[in-house]
């Protein structure tokens, strides 16, 4: 039995990196933008979900960790504390 070729998930175009498109760098003080890249549990979303480039994903992770350290972002959501 052979598998037919057209039965997989449809491929979508790669999403363009928001930071590169806007010409900005992730900043720990921009809490509203950083929250878009966190799950409800407070975890950092992976690149495959956000479409951010590898370079900006590393900078984003550092910015989120800095914001957490300075208590601008919660380390854990309120319902788990």
Curated annotation (Swiss-Prot):
A single MF term (Gene Ontology): structural constituent of ribosome
GO CC, any one term: cytosolic small ribosomal subunit
Alphabetical list of NCBIfam families matching this protein: S18
Function field: Binds as a heterodimer with protein bS6 to the central domain of the 16S rRNA, where it helps stabilize the platform of the 30S subunit.
Subunit (UniProt): Part of the 30S ribosomal subunit. Forms a tight heterodimer with protein bS6.
PANTHER family linked: 30S RIBOSOMAL PROTEIN S18, SMALL RIBOSOMAL SUBUNIT PROTEIN BS18M
Family: Belongs to the bacterial ribosomal protein bS18 family.
Protein name: Small ribosomal subunit protein bS18
Originating species: Chloroflexus aggregans (strain MD-66 / DSM 9485)
UniProt lineage: Bacteria, Bacillati, Chloroflexota, Chloroflexia, Chloroflexales
């Amino acid at each position: 039995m052979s598998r037919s070729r057209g039965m997989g998930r449809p491929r979508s175009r790669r999403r363009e990196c928001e930071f590169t498109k806007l010409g900005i760098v992730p900043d720990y003080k921009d809490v509203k933008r950083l929250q878009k890249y966190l799950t409800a549990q407070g975890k950092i979303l992976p690149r495959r979900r956000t479409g951010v480039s590898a370079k900006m994903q590393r900078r984003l992770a550092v910015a989120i960790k800095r914001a957490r350290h300075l208590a601008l972002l919660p380390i854990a959501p309120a319902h788990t504390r």
